[in-house]
Amino acid sequence: MDESSSGIASTGVIASSVPRAVLRTAWYRMAAFMKIARALLACLCAQAGVAVAQHGAASSNMTLLGYEPLAGRSAYQPVIHRQGERWIAYVGHHGGKTQNPLTGRAEDNGTSIIDVTDPRKPRLVAHIPGEPGDGETGGAQMVRVCSGADLPKADKSKVYLLRTFGNLGHEVWDVTAPEKPAKVVTVVDKLKGTHKSWWECDSGIAYLVSGLPDWRTRRMTQVFDLSDPAHPRLIRNFGMPGQQPGSTGPVPTELHGPISTGAKGNRVYFGYGTNKSGVMQIVDRAKLLAGPHEPTAANLAAPEVGRFTLSSMNGAHTTLPVLGTNLPEFARDKGAPRDFVLVVDESLANECLEPRQRVFVVDVTDEKTPVGVATFNVPEKPGDFCSRGGRFGSHSSNENQPPMYAGKVAFFAWFNAGVRAVDISDPFHPREIGYYIPATTDKTDKRCVKTESGERCKVAIQTNNVEVDDRGYVYIVDRANTGMHILELGR
């Protein structure tokens, strides 16, 4: 607040009849009163368990281009796909139910389809309802998209969407006309869990995070051939030894999600664990696909090349490979270029009531013995993120790696600290080069922690996931119902 915006000095009649010194004194008294009133209101609301809005937008070297509210749905995963001359964003949602602004009808949260051809004017064109239920028990969190022109046995004129249906199953939809999505097939159903799957568009191989009823874990991998999406073919079920039916002893950490380098790279990087007891597993893709499919301990162990084990305090949510990195420092050394994987943990507890979750940079040049070489963390100060409300810590990275960013810049979703842009050109020394924290809105939901007298709730941004498109635009979606923001990184 300043004198020109207060409304006092800008009124000509008052200014001409009252001495300026008196006006200035009145302005300062009013400003002090408003500050005290706001603090008192916040205190009273906090004592009553009422949510209080926390902040406006904040940024450095990142600019907001466009915004889509997503009907106030809690959002998990964005994927952006070029379809002819159009660019379409597909956003998976957590469970819940709200009105579809296109139809006026209440729908269970599922998949939002947004035309982002003009990133400054994103436009919701369709919503596919998901499984009924709230939070993790409903919705359709995960989305992947492939063009039929890329899939070996698909209709070349089609575009296909692979998505979860709550925790129950996986589906394929025809989204050739984004405004009129049509279901193609249920790939698998009657599951007890799903999550962040991966789909190779050039081969059609899909690594589906599933929970088969007879397995000992909520999340493992089902490998499917979706080269013809209308006719799915199961290749094998896969997980860590000890997770399979009939095994005994402690159950290894459940799967979170895989990222494959395809046939050319011949590696799949699996992330197990969320915020504790994490494992990054390196798997030989060819052996995974062609090896014996019976889920015995020996058969499950056979494709593994190596693994990186995190502490009991950190998990492995996202495992982003950054391979073939040329570093001037090591140009003449044996082992150049070098391969890395960015292992991103997920924060789960509000207001820092858990070990800090962050990014681990793992050197996998020697795949049998991966070694951590660096970490990236967002400092709690000066943003006071532990007291803002909601989660503070890492969650995920972008997964698309277009030429302008590949091996150079990675983006990390950091819940109430927004999205962070990080220079990874020297993986031994990751360096933040920008950030964007959206403003809360009237749709932003509260986040609560238990107290001795009940609970304390605060409204806070919860940047949940981030993705980039091949044009270089950055997309972030919010877990606390704030919508999708489209950003541009400064050069």
Spans of features found by a protein language model:
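Extreme N-terminal basic, low-complexity initiation segments
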Residues: 2-10
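Feature marking well-ordered beta-strand scaffolds used for ligand recognition
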Residues: 30, 52-491
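Bacterial N-terminal signal peptides
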Residues: 37-48
